[in-house]
Amino acid sequence: MHVDDFSFDLPEALIAHHPPEQRRDSRLLCLDRDTGAVADRRFPDLVDLLRPEDLLVLNDTRVIPARLFGHKPTGGRVEVLVERPLDRHRVLARLRASKVPAPGTVLTLEGGVAAEVTGREGEFFTLRFTAEQTVLELLEHHGHMPLPPYIRRADVAADRERYQTVFARRPGAVAAPTAGLHFDNELLARIGARGVDTAWVTLHVGSGTFAPLRVSDPREHRMHSEWLDVPPATCAAIERARGRGGRVVAVGTTVVRALETAAQDGAVQPYQGETDIFIYPGHRFHAVDALVTNFHLPGSTLLMLVSAFAGRERVLAAYRHAVAQRYRFFSYGDAMFIAAGAADE
């Protein structure tokens, strides 16, 4: 296996830098995971592709405005990207500056916020904010939405809403679970009216989701760690769905990683803690029967996960079809629905 096995040609013009006017305006490419057959649909058609006995599992993480700009005591500019809060006043963060600040350096950030560099852990730094407000309160007031690096523009006020799912509840992610961005409340209501149950997991997406592989053999790659919670109620909902012959439909690769982490012994069990699970071709799936997902970067771990689910050649053929049909790619782009028989329903 080589990372180049997961490459494809993508014209720059197909990278979506802005969301569609309405969440549901996205297109939906349906892929049969068994045969490779594809069909072009619209995202609201997902209602008809789901069956009353199915279970839709969504990630309720909430993106925090994790990016801050400021300067060092020397006047040099610095950018802070919070990876995760450690407590009420400390964070783990990436720093971008012409020269890395040493421990003890006090950074002056937007709004006059002061943060002291207290240590370094590999590619991350620990920062302590000196204000009385909590880290999350400071970020809500002064932070910027952490748009992905391939969206080459500054964040705007609308991103506070659109780079966030309508069901986001638990703050902690620094990247959106983007498959969930296509759902609005009306679409969720229609899915519920069809008889489809909904369940929740939390996986706080880290900035490592955008990190390129630095090895040629993906099996040598070490995944970043992310916090997740698969509650007992979700495990019970999965058992009920399976009992009535329904499918477990994961909305996004984050849900797949959460459920497969919780099902490493076969059945999905309650789980709360860290995961660094890396799913690539050869993985045996225990928890997921169908997948709603966006289009992913060439050579990325997320494309490898989708390839594990539906087969590398079938997925890459579907991507070539998507390019030819000018689908929009990545976080603000279009979506796929992958399941057995998905192109025929």
Curated annotation (Swiss-Prot):
Task: Give GO cellular component annotations, separated by semicolons.
Answer: cytoplasm
- Localisation: Cytoplasm
Q: Where is the signal peptide?
A: none
Primary localization:
cytoplasm
Task: Name the enzyme group at the top EC level.
Answer: transferase
Q: Which reaction does it catalyse?
A: 7-aminomethyl-7-carbaguanosine(34) in tRNA + S-adenosyl-L-methionine = epoxyqueuosine(34) in tRNA + adenine + L-methionine + 2 H(+)
State the superkingdom: Bacteria
Pathway noted in the entry: tRNA modification; tRNA-queuosine biosynthesis
Keywords in UniProt for this one?
Answer: Cytoplasm, Queuosine biosynthesis, S-adenosyl-L-methionine, Transferase
Gene Ontology terms describing biological process: queuosine biosynthetic process; tRNA wobble guanine modification
The Enzyme Commission number assigned here is 2.4.99.17
GO molecular function annotation: S-adenosylmethionine:tRNA ribosyltransferase-isomerase activity
Subunit composition and interactions: Monomer.
The role this protein plays is:
Transfers and isomerizes the ribose moiety from AdoMet to the 7-aminomethyl group of 7-deazaguanine (preQ1-tRNA) to give epoxyqueuosine (oQ-tRNA).
Q: HAMAP family attached here?
A: QueA (MF_00113)
Similarity section: Belongs to the QueA family.
Question: What's this protein's name?
Answer: S-adenosylmethionine:tRNA ribosyltransferase-isomerase
Q: Which gene encodes it?
A: queA
